[in-house]
Structure formats: structure tokens, C-alpha cells
């Protein structure tokens, strides 16, 4: 019995103290020699049983929080009780009048027997908020609650049209997620993973995507005005028809990105890399591309009036039917073909 209580207490600590994939694997692995033997001869039966119990613990916690809190932003209750978890009572006692330890105390009891553990309050609250986020947006609970970096695990989530204004999505995993038409105005997505996500038509104005991964993402028609994309990875992203007015893309990796039809007026793309990028019928008036790597990029029918390409790498860059009035190219590196084009057609603007 005590070993069962110990196991459940360990699961509770792993689920609500860490919530990561590694924590889940550790909590559901066989613990004793006998369990290892049984697990082997049942082709993982012990692990499957433990994983089922782990998932039930998470789902019960989510439902309990949802039923006891008026909304996701409300303070957590000082005492959270989960009854009948495999015949046991699981109680979470938060710091307060009855708990001066500063940690969340987990008590698992059955009859006269009990086991206790302690969980850092900050981790516990972050995990509870992640469970409530999933409840609010009708997402099924996942046994992996957080990423290794401490962000929410929302991999493959369907959040079409969701209102995520000012949401904290730092270090979250939204790879493969569908956020078409969602509103992420002023959202903090620093370090988040949006690889392969659908962000078509999303409102991302004034949002923070610093060092975020947007590789292979679809962002057609999205609004990114005044967004912070410094150091972000946008390789192979589709930004067709995006509005990126005064967007900060300095140092971003935009290799092979498609920016056709995008509006990049006064966008800061200094130090960005756009090798092999396709930029057709875009508006880039006053854009800053100093020190940018534009090798083999293709500019077709694009308005670059007043753009700054000083010190940029323009080797084998294609400029066709573009507006290049008042263009700055001081100390830019150019291939012979690019230099010839400028000399022949736009010498008055160099």
C-alpha cells in the first residue's frame, strides 16, 4: 500500500512540479525489480498502467480547477482536493495561513497511511494555468504539459479564431498548430516554436516573436505591424500579402521566405539574411536592409523607394522592374551583373 501511495505522490510531484516529457517518463517508469520483470513480460503493461493513472491525475486536476475557479486568471485556491484517485485522496496545500513552508505541499492519503511531497509554487502555478488554458479553448489535456524550457505544450493545437491578446506564450511549443484568424495582438511569444504552424490571417501586431521559430509556417495575410521578430527563424515561411509596417526583423533568418505582396514600409531588416527569398510586388519604402544578406534573393516589381541597402550582400541578387529611387547602396557587395544593372538603369540613385 505504502509503495502505491509513494508512487502516486511521485506522479503528482512530477506532473505538477515539472510537467515535462522527461518528468512524465520518469514518473511512469517501473520502479522496482518486480515491476521491471512484470513490465517486460507484459510488453510494457506496468508503464501503460502508470501512464493511464498519470493522465487521469492530470484530467482530474484540470476539471477540479475549472469547477472551483471563476476564470483562468483568478487566484488559485489555497487547497485543491482530488478525491478517489485509485482509491486515494490527493490534496495540494498552497502557501498561506495553513502552510508557511513557501512550497506547495502534496499529501496522498488512504486510510491511516499518507505520503507527502513538496512542489515549487511557481512551477505548480504555471502548470495549473496551462491546464486551464486547455480547458478554456477546449483542447484535450496532454500528459506533457510544459516544454523543457517551461512554456506551454500546445503542439498541433487547434486555436482557429482564438483571442490570445496579450497572452504569455514564451517558450511554448505550437509547432503544427492551427491559429488561422487568431488574435495575438501584443502577445509575448519569445522563444516559442511555431514551426509548420498555420498563422494565416492572424493579428500579430505589436507582438513579441524574438528568437521564435516560424520555420515553414504559413502566415498569408497576417498582420505583423510593429511586431518584434529580432533573431527569429522564418526560413521557408510564407508571408504572402502580410502587413509588416515598421516590423523589427533585425537579425532574423528569412532564407527562402516568400514575401510577395507584403507591405514592409520602414521595416527594420538590418543584419537579416534573406538568401533565395522571393519578393514580388512588395512595398518596401524606407525599409532598412543594412548589412542584410540578400544573395540570390529575387525582387520583382517591388517598391524599394528610399530603402537602405548599405553594406548589404547583393551578390547574384535579382532586381526586375523595381522602383529604386533614393536607394542607398554604400559599401554594398554586388556581383558584376547586379552592378551593371544599377549602372545602366539606376545610376542616378546610387
UniProtKB/Swiss-Prot annotation:
This is Secreted effector protein PipB2. Induction: Expression of the gene is regulated by the two-component regulatory system SsrA/SsrB. It is also activated by SlyA and controlled by the two-component regulatory system PhoP/PhoQ. Expressed in host macrophages and when grown in an acidic environment. Effector proteins function to alter host cell physiology and promote bacterial survival in host tissues. Involved in the reorganization of late endosome/lysosome (LE/Lys) compartments in mammalian cells. Necessary and sufficient to link kinesin-1 onto the Salmonella-containing vacuole (SCV) membrane. Required for centrifugal extension of lysosomal glycoprotein-rich membrane tubules, known as Salmonella-induced filaments (Sifs), away from the SCV and toward the cell periphery. Required for virulence, but not for intracellular survival and replication in phagocytic cells. The keyword RNA-binding does not apply. Interacts with the host kinesin light chain (KLC), a subunit of the kinesin-1 motor complex. GO terms for cellular component: extracellular region; host cell membrane; membrane. Keywords: Host membrane, Membrane, Repeat, Secreted, Virulence. Its main location: secreted. It comes from the Bacteria. It is found in: Secreted; Host membrane.
